[in-house]
């Protein structure tokens, strides 16, 4: 088997993979309307009922017991939202039901040129619906009332985490039929005080509190009526079918946008919107979590550990997609008090914090089928960054370490290529001698390989072994929120998007051309022409790929050129002295 043909097959496989990713960019997901891109937390929701956007989607008593479909009941929406602000979150709570209807991530600007505009995670405007709902349903649950969801009252209309304050508590109160309810939100300081402003700006994981993006939600039920109160806690995430704003602004490749749940059989089960279009998902689980995923960010409800919950996904009558759960029945005797709680995570996909919150939640950082290789690569990259403080230089350092790890394999590949280059005149002579008799030509080639002690697969197999590492690193750079808006130097201000001036892809094409010059020339003229086109083809596709990935490829090629040049010259020198 001709070594160049093997390399060509590998190269074409890579190009085919990149073609699929590029196709996803162009056809995988529609653009998000511009009007939904911004979030204004100072503007309340419409003060009139709207069947298209104000359905409560509250599980009924029947659904909490048996998992049947929730009711879609239009309710009035209050015109005054409760504003809450910490050092990492800027959000709004609707007193009608106590849902979080708007949420911006202060440490993650939507665009680099607008650092004062936070990325909008939750929104309930005209163009986009995405919110976190929770409440009490069941026999006596106030959210199951035919009059609509409860209208809570708060002591203030706005709350802000003060300097030196590590926790902010927001209480919403409601009373009905002798039962007093308090819906309590607990927010936490996100950034550690002992970190410098520079370290905070670099978003070092060591400077982010593990509960920075966790919101504690608890219900205090004080039953002062003359009978036993009965109900169920529910929580759900509701989102419309709009595109992912983080994906359309960050990179040209479409990533997963949809729901995911934890089940006993699968610690990370994805349920896409297409799945919800076809059928509902229902399963009884103990503990676990339900989540909605998008590029770089995730929202998840995490119930109390050890309790049995009914997990479900479905599509409501307004075309919104819902993933959530209903808890076990709570009974509060007359004159008694009960508290039940859960946790909402709304923020970036920080693997360490997600894993600590609930097992399997870190898998929402979806590295694909090579996750078992990608996770150690990210772990190493993150530790390098903790020392260097720049993700670009960290990628370069990681590339050097990976190259050192594969040095023996690469050396074997380059030695095989060098030997092939040395015997290329003999290979050309065999081709001319046997002409169109391919069987005799193949036999003569195999005899030549045996005589010269050349393994025709020696240059291809090491490359194949390294391909999973390359693909894993691709997903690490694509999926890790740490790369989002991370600068390197000069013109590279965001490693997660394409090079704005295409300098790195052009340099990469140049390094591939140099590598090609060091390789033996294919005996087949047509094959030689195709190989000459490979640097151009790769350069074209890499024009739109994340600068961080292209940086890795450029550095890897430069190291490969140096290694290949050294080995080739060494073998040629030995051949001359022999």
Curated annotation (Swiss-Prot):
Annotated keywords: Cell inner membrane, Cell membrane, Chaperone, Membrane, Protein transport, Transmembrane, Transmembrane helix, Transport
Gene3D superfamilies, per the entry: 2.70.98.90
Transmembrane parts of this sequence: 3-23, 361-381, 387-407, 457-477, 500-520, 535-555
Signal peptide location: none
Region annotation (Disordered) ranges: 34-72
Positions with biased composition (Polar residues): 37-66
Membrane topology value: Multi-pass membrane protein
Molecular function GO terms recorded: membrane insertase activity
Membrane found in the keyword field: yes
Example GO BP: protein insertion into membrane
Keyword Glycoprotein: no
Subcellular location: Cell inner membrane
Domain of life: Bacteria
Entry's family note: Belongs to the OXA1/ALB3/YidC family. Type 1 subfamily.
Subunit structure: Interacts with the Sec translocase complex via SecD. Specifically interacts with transmembrane segments of nascent integral membrane proteins during membrane integration.
Name of protein: Membrane protein insertase YidC
UniProt source species: Pseudomonas aeruginosa (strain LESB58)
